Amino acid sequence: MSNNEIVFVTGNANKLKEVQSILTQEVDNNNKTIHLINEALDLEELQDTDLNAIALAKGKQAVAALGKGKPVFVEDTALRFDEFNGLPGAYIKWFLKSMGLEKIVKMLEPFENKNAEAVTTICFADSRGEYHFFQGITRGKIVPSRGPTTFGWDSIFEPFDSHGLTYAEMSKDAKNAISHRGKAFAQFKEYLYQNDF
């Protein structure tokens, strides 16, 4: 592995494309370039509401699978409904799989409060075996599905600062500028450019 290679553990092709777009954008910082390597490992998901604990469990599994000394990161995303005290949270993937987008929207139908927050938590294990966390949060509301339904729950989440568009209706660059994932990876990218890893 070269000095600036890091491994991203994900089997989600859409997530990989989005992260590549964010992390590999040119940054004028000591001519440092990040080389992203993808590993699609099958990691067990800790069932918990603590997003750092979930990300750390996945990070430790990734280090165990790939071997110590390789900079590696994992990412976990949650969708928290205000009306449900933060649920489904990290369980959103399972809600999507078992219910689908339409039924998730219907869950909030009886309630006036449709507000939610999208959260991305990154766990990065550096080459020294130290773990670092980065988190991005975007506030918004749950709406009936609009736009392409090819990327998780993007078509039902309308950020407050999106001018009335769901994530799915936004351009990639516009979404990355305000999204939970974009915010978390902006922090992570800054860390990578300022530190040896």
Curated annotation (Swiss-Prot):
<dbReference type="GO" id="GO:0036218">
    <property type="term" value="F:dTTP diphosphatase activity"/>
</dbReference>
<feature type="binding site">
    <location>
        <begin position="151"/>
        <end position="154"/>
    </location>
    <ligand>
        <name>ITP</name>
    </ligand>
</feature>
<keyword id="KW-0547">Nucleotide-binding</keyword>
<dbReference type="GO" id="GO:0047429">
    <property type="term" value="F:nucleoside triphosphate diphosphatase activity"/>
</dbReference>
<dbReference type="GO" id="GO:0036220">
    <property type="term" value="F:ITP diphosphatase activity"/>
</dbReference>
<dbReference type="InterPro" id="IPR002637">
    <property type="entry name" value="RdgB/HAM1"/>
</dbReference>
<protein>
    <recommendedName>
        <fullName>Inosine triphosphate pyrophosphatase</fullName>
        <ecNumber>3.6.1.66</ecNumber>
    </recommendedName>
</protein>
<dbReference type="InterPro" id="IPR029001">
    <property type="entry name" value="ITPase-like_fam"/>
</dbReference>
<dbReference type="GO" id="GO:0005737">
    <property type="term" value="C:cytoplasm"/>
</dbReference>
<dbReference type="GO" id="GO:0008828">
    <property type="term" value="F:dATP diphosphatase activity"/>
</dbReference>
<comment type="subunit">
    <text>Homodimer.</text>
</comment>
<dbReference type="GO" id="GO:0009217">
    <property type="term" value="P:purine deoxyribonucleoside triphosphate catabolic process"/>
</dbReference>
<dbReference type="GO" id="GO:0009213">
    <property type="term" value="P:pyrimidine deoxyribonucleoside triphosphate catabolic process"/>
</dbReference>
<keyword id="KW-0460">Magnesium</keyword>
<feature type="binding site">
    <location>
        <position position="58"/>
    </location>
    <ligand>
        <name>ITP</name>
    </ligand>
</feature>
<dbReference type="InterPro" id="IPR027502">
    <property type="entry name" value="ITPase"/>
</dbReference>
<dbReference type="GO" id="GO:0000166">
    <property type="term" value="F:nucleotide binding"/>
</dbReference>
<dbReference type="GO" id="GO:0005634">
    <property type="term" value="C:nucleus"/>
</dbReference>
<dbReference type="Pfam" id="PF01725">
    <property type="entry name" value="Ham1p_like"/>
</dbReference>
<dbReference type="GO" id="GO:0036222">
    <property type="term" value="F:XTP diphosphatase activity"/>
</dbReference>
<dbReference type="GO" id="GO:0036221">
    <property type="term" value="F:UTP diphosphatase activity"/>
</dbReference>
<feature type="binding site">
    <location>
        <begin position="180"/>
        <end position="181"/>
    </location>
    <ligand>
        <name>ITP</name>
    </ligand>
</feature>
<dbReference type="GO" id="GO:0036217">
    <property type="term" value="F:dGTP diphosphatase activity"/>
</dbReference>
<feature type="binding site">
    <location>
        <begin position="10"/>
        <end position="15"/>
    </location>
    <ligand>
        <name>ITP</name>
    </ligand>
</feature>
<keyword id="KW-0479">Metal-binding</keyword>
<dbReference type="GO" id="GO:0036219">
    <property type="term" value="F:GTP diphosphatase activity"/>
</dbReference>
<keyword id="KW-0378">Hydrolase</keyword>
<dbReference type="GO" id="GO:0009143">
    <property type="term" value="P:nucleoside triphosphate catabolic process"/>
</dbReference>
<dbReference type="GO" id="GO:0047840">
    <property type="term" value="F:dCTP diphosphatase activity"/>
</dbReference>
<comment type="similarity">
    <text>Belongs to the HAM1 NTPase family.</text>
</comment>
<keyword id="KW-0546">Nucleotide metabolism</keyword>
<feature type="binding site">
    <location>
        <position position="93"/>
    </location>
    <ligand>
        <name>ITP</name>
    </ligand>
</feature>
<dbReference type="GO" id="GO:0035870">
    <property type="term" value="F:dITP diphosphatase activity"/>
</dbReference>
<feature type="binding site">
    <location>
        <position position="175"/>
    </location>
    <ligand>
        <name>ITP</name>
    </ligand>
</feature>
<dbReference type="GO" id="GO:0009117">
    <property type="term" value="P:nucleotide metabolic process"/>
</dbReference>
<comment type="function">
    <text>Pyrophosphatase that hydrolyzes the non-canonical purine nucleotides inosine triphosphate (ITP), deoxyinosine triphosphate (dITP) as well as 2'-deoxy-N-6-hydroxylaminopurine triphosphate (dHAPTP) and 5-bromodeoxyuridine 5'-triphosphate (BrdUTP) to their respective monophosphate derivatives. Xanthosine 5'-triphosphate (XTP) is also a potential substrate. The enzyme does not distinguish between the deoxy- and ribose forms. Probably excludes non-canonical purines from RNA and DNA precursor pools, thus preventing their incorporation into RNA and DNA and avoiding chromosomal lesions.</text>
</comment>
<dbReference type="GO" id="GO:0046872">
    <property type="term" value="F:metal ion binding"/>
</dbReference>
<keyword id="KW-0464">Manganese</keyword>
<feature type="binding site">
    <location>
        <begin position="76"/>
        <end position="77"/>
    </location>
    <ligand>
        <name>ITP</name>
    </ligand>
</feature>
<keyword id="KW-0963">Cytoplasm</keyword>
<keyword id="KW-0539">Nucleus</keyword>
<dbReference type="GO" id="GO:0004170">
    <property type="term" value="F:dUTP diphosphatase activity"/>
</dbReference>
